[in-house]
Amino acid sequence: LQTYPGVFTGIGEFSVHKEFVSAKVSGDVASLIDPALDRIFDFTAESGLLSILHTDIHMPFVKPEFKRLYFDQALDLFRRHPKSTIIWAHTGLGRVVQPVADHLAMLEEILADPALKHVYFDISWDEVAKYVVATPDATRLTAALIEKYPDRFLMGSDNVALTEPQALFAVFNQYQPLWDA
């Protein structure tokens, strides 16, 4: 940051609980309760860098009694770092981690909490788009949440293996039912 001032704006692409990716990394398995993660967020607060956190909102193939485990750990992390700007990539979803029945309610729990106004959600992935436009109800409810909190949702370029601009536009276009809602 001192060598190239103004060049870097954030820390992206770091994963904690991300489907089966986290288990493939050598060394200790990342965790939302690991003090090392606190040091990263302390640094982002101190330096003014934002962070894009890739972590699942729940476990793959989650059983109902465990659906809030990762979510509650994320809430605790967010509360410990109120001066860090945090973007939760893909609203915590993925190829295997699909929305549970109250997924949007969980997001709204964060959005409605004034102590968590530093947390944003990125929706730029074709897997997320599939869930959002899967049914008219899913699209309508997502649109209502975005309309209620329009400054907390981001559509960026965080798409897996993006090789050309047309791929980015294809993801954007998948959301057309949401844009029309």
Predicted segments — roles?
Residues 1-59, 120, 125:
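Active-site gating/metal-coordination segments in enzymes
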Residues 85-181:
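H/E-rich (His + Asp/Glu) clusters that bind or coordinate divalent metals
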Residues 50, 82-85:
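Short, proline-centered helix/strand-breaking motifs
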Residues 26-37, 66-73, 101-106, 135-141:
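Charged helix-capping and loop-helix junction motifs
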